[in-house]
Amino acid sequence: MLVKFAGLYERVIRLKGGDIAFFSNIYDELQTLADNNIAYEIVPGITAASGASAYTGVPLTARDHSRGAQLLTYYRDTVISNEVWKQLAAFEETLVFYMSSNNLTSIVQHLLNAGAEKNIPFIVVEQATTPNQKVKSFTLQSFSEVPEQDFTSPSIVIMGKVASLYKQFNWFNSDNATAANYFRSVEEETGYLKIQSFIQQKNSEHVNRTKTQIS
């Protein structure tokens, strides 16, 4: 599609949620562009780990809590070997699991079987940075003792000592007096209907123009 549209239009934008450097197809897409001598520019975004960290008040690194973080994904058993599970269980810093909430029961069990401490805390952030954001807190032990849960997609898991800071510094989903809330979702603004009407109008114009070109 990139090659096709690059041949049709002067400028083409390929949008992706988060940041294209994390868990994306950027390598394949850049290779395709390079093979076809198509010039490109990469604009960085905010990856889910950073967004969820900011909107929960849970830093990925913090003095006396974590000196580093590992970003992983776990969508099937073959992705992580038993040897790697042992390394993760012994890892004393922050673990962040992308696109893995549906397999969280397996993740917790693998870590416990590999010798991880039962009291390691973690949070599951559902729909991070949106007005629908919800956060659920667990420890490895407490999660293993409850029935399997369903989480709203997309969700991200932040695991390690830093997760214990959520209760203290959570500002988005709380009545915390220090929560300034300078930024509000557009739904709360009086101009939302005007913006919605403008977008609908432009979409309608685009559809009509496309129909004319096809006919």
Predicted region positions:
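A contiguous loop/helix-start segment that scaffolds small-molecule binding in enzyme catalytic cores
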Residues: 7-13, 25, 29-31, 68, ...
